[in-house]
Amino acid sequence: MNGKKLYISDVTLRDGMHAIRHQYSLDDVRAIATALDRAKVDSIEVAHGDGLQGSSFNYGFGAHTDLEWIEAAADAVSHAKIATLLLPGIGTIHDLKNAYDAGARIVRVATHCTEADVSRQHIEYARELGMDTVGFLMMSHMQTPEGLAQQAKLMESYGATCIYVVDSGGAMNMEDIRARFRTVKAVLKADTETGIHAHHNLSLGVANSIAAVEEGCDRIDASLAGMGAGAGNAPLEVFIAAADKLGWNHGTDLYALMDAADDLVRPLQDRPVRVDRETLALGYAGVYSSFLRHSEMAAARYGIKAVDILVELGKRRMVGGQEDMIVDVALDLLARR
C-alpha cells in the first residue's frame, strides 16, 4: 500500500435505495449524509437506485426526485463530495446538468460491461462540466478480463479518469476480481484510477474489495450496514475495520460509521439486507442484485418461489434494465407447472 490514501466512496444513498424501494425521506438523506460527512468519507453517492431519472414504472417510483435528494445531501456536507449515477438511456446530459446545479460534483456513468460505447456523450459532457468523471462497468462478471479491459479503455478514451469494476450480481470471487483488475490496469494509463463496487451476495463483498486494493485499486464503494441491492454492498464499517487491521490509510472514523450503520440505516430496512436464500441465489446465478425486490413481488403475486425466478433469470442472462422480463419469467414458470 505504501501509505496510499484509499478513496472511500459511500453508496448508502444510491444503491441503498434499492433496499427500501427508493423511499428515503429528505430527513433520512440529511441525517445519513451528515453522519457520513462527520466520519470523513470522501464521497457520498445520491440518486434513485437506478440513477438519474430512474423513478419509473419499470424500476419503481421514488419518494422524492433525484434533485431533491441531491440538494438535501449537498446542504448537509462540508467535507465529502456529492456523487451521482447516470445510466445512458435512462438519464440524459440535461439531467446531469441539473444534478450538477443541485450540488453533484462526481458522476459515475454506468453501462453494461459490453456497452461502454453508449457512454461517450455523457462522459464527454461531464468533463465539460468539470465533474470528476467515472466509468462504471456493471455486471463485470459477464465479461472476460480481456473483454472488460477493452471496454475500460473505451471509457478512458472518452475522458473518464477512473474506471470501476462493478460486481452488480455479487457473483465474483477474489480470483475473479484479481484477474479483472490486473488486466484492466495493464491497458489503462498510469494516472487513470480504478474502483471496486462489490455486492455481498456470496458474503465476499469485503474480501473482494480487499483483493482489489491489493491489486492497486484506488476507490472503494461501500455502504452503511451494507445497505444496497440484494444482500447489499460491502458493508462500509466492516471494510473500514478490516482495512484498519491491515494498516491501510482510509482517513475515516470507524466508530462513527458503526453508529450510523446501526442507529440510522438498519432501522430503515423493511426487508433485512443480508445473505439469505433469495440473495444467495442472486450471487450464485449471477443475477443483477436489484432484481431481488421485483422478483419477490412477482413470486408473491403468482404463488411461485422467488429463487426459481432468480435462477431462471440467470439462465437467460438477463441484465440491468430488463426488469420487465421478471413477470414474463414468472408466467413462464407458472405455465410449466
Swiss-Prot record:
Keywords: Aromatic hydrocarbons catabolism, Lyase, Manganese, Metal-binding
PROSITE patterns reported for this sequence: PYR_CT
Binding annotation for Mn(2+): 15, 197, 199
Catalytic reactions of this protein: (S)-4-hydroxy-2-oxopentanoate = acetaldehyde + pyruvate
Binding positions (substrate): 14-15, 168, 197, 288
One term of GO molecular function: 4-hydroxy-2-oxovalerate aldolase activity
Active site per the UniProt annotation: 18
Residue numbers marked as site, Transition state stabilizer: 14
InterPro entries on file: 2-IPM_HCS-like, 4OH_2_O-val_aldolase, Aldolase_TIM, DmpG_comm, DRE_TIM_HOA, PYR_CT
Enzyme nomenclature, EC number: 4.1.3.39
Domain of life: Bacteria
Record-level GO BP terms: catabolic process; L-leucine biosynthetic process
CDD domains: DRE_TIM_HOA (cd07943)
Domain Pyruvate carboxyltransferase: from-to ranges: 6-258
SUPFAM superfamilies: Aldolase, post-HMGL domain-like
Family affiliation: Belongs to the 4-hydroxy-2-oxovalerate aldolase family.
Alphabetized HAMAP family for the sequence: HOA
Identification of the protein by name: 4-hydroxy-2-oxovalerate aldolase 1
Species annotation: Pseudomonas putida (strain W619)
